[in-house]
Structures are given as structure tokens and as C-alpha cells.
């Protein structure tokens, strides 16, 4: 039977990795949203709040349009660009491997302690 200190160490490792995983998830989520709200107040942008531009009265006169020109219709196969691949993650960004690996180690330590 393992001593109590091993049980406590395993629980400590698991909870530390849990909080680290939450931190990784928050860091990954922060890049998606650049504006973090605190206390119900939004963070103002550096360029100031957006205000609609004032425009003068619009002139709505009759528009003269010429005969519509139709271009030659292409019946050949359309050229497609190279297939899009997933972009590489930013350096230091949280990935599934970087978050799941500490949990796996902590879970193995927890199982080994019991």
C-alpha cells in the first residue's frame, strides 16, 4: 500500500495540470478574441470608438446606362488553386498534444498511486 504522501502528490499533480490546461485553453481562446471584458465594461480600441461618418445629402438623379456587354462564356473546366491546408499553429500556441499530455501523465500517476 502506498503512503499518503504519494496520494497527495498524485492529487497535487493532477490538479496542477488541470489548472495548467485551463490556462492553455484561455490562452488559445484569447487569440480569437482580442477584446477582453472586465467588470462588464469593454476594452476600448486604440483608435477610439467607432462613429458613423456624416455624409451630405445624396443626389438621386437618373443614371444613364449603356448597353450591357456580355463576355465570352467559358465552357471549359475551371482552374482550381492548390488545395488549402490547415495553417501551422503559432509558436507557443496551445495544441491538443500540449494540453492532453500533462493530463495523461497526471492520470497515470494518480492510477499508480492507488
UniProtKB/Swiss-Prot annotation:
Sequence repeats lie at residues 48-52, 56-60, 61-65, 66-70, 71-75, 76-80, 81-85. GO terms for cellular component: plasma membrane; side of membrane. Residues 93-114 form a propeptide. Keywords: Cell membrane, Glycoprotein, GPI-anchor, Lipoprotein, Membrane, Repeat, Signal. It comes from the Eukaryota. Residues 33-95 are annotated as: Disordered. Pfam families: Trypan_PARP. This is Procyclic form-specific polypeptide A-alpha. The gene is PARPA-ALPHA. A lipid is attached at residue 92 (GPI-anchor amidated glycine). It is found in: Cell membrane. Residues 47-89 have a biased composition (Acidic residues). It comes from Trypanosoma brucei brucei.
Amino acid at each position: 500500500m502506498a503512503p499518503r504522501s504519494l496520494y497527495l502528490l498524485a492529487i497535487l499533480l493532477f490538479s496542477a495540470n488541470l489548472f495548467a490546461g485551463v490556462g492553455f485553453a484561455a490562452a488559445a481562446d484569447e487569440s480569437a478574441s482580442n477584446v477582453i471584458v472586465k467588470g462588464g465594461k469593454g476594452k476600448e480600441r486604440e483608435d477610439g470608438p467607432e462613429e458613423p461618418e456624416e455624409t451630405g445629402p445624396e443626389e438621386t438623379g437618373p443614371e444613364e446606362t449603356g448597353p450591357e456587354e456580355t463576355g465570352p462564356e467559358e465552357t471549359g473546366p475551371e482552374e482550381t488553386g492548390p488545395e488549402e491546408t490547415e495553417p501551422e499553429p503559432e509558436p507557443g500556441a496551445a495544441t491538443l498534444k500540449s494540453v492532453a499530455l500533462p493530463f495523461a501523465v497526471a492520470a497515470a500517476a494518480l492510477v499508480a498511486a492507488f
